Amino acid sequence: MLRNITIFDAQEIQSISNFELGYDVNLDIVKKQIRKLTNDNKHNIIIGFENEQTRKIIGFVHAELYESLYMDTGLNILGLAVDSNFQGQGIG
């Protein structure tokens, strides 16, 4: 199930970022960034995919809205990752 991420998802986001993206990130930094970025919904979109059985985030996408002179509003994907245990199942 797709849903907005919350501060309670920080542990899963940290783990996915570490193991699937290769970023050795600190849990406190992940929490700080979730707080900051989820409060900026005019520029940042962060959606998680929740495992319906465990209610844990098993994948996420972070995108940023942007404007340019030559087209309407665009969307840059800054991060997209799925827990390797769930890859190949159409999640990402």
Predicted regions and their residues:
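Acetyl-CoA-dependent GNAT
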Residues: 4-73, 78
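Conserved acetyl-CoA pyrophosphate-binding loop and the N-cap/start of the following alpha-helix
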Residues: 86, 90-91
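Residue-level recognition of the GNAT/N-acetyltransferase active site
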Residues: 83
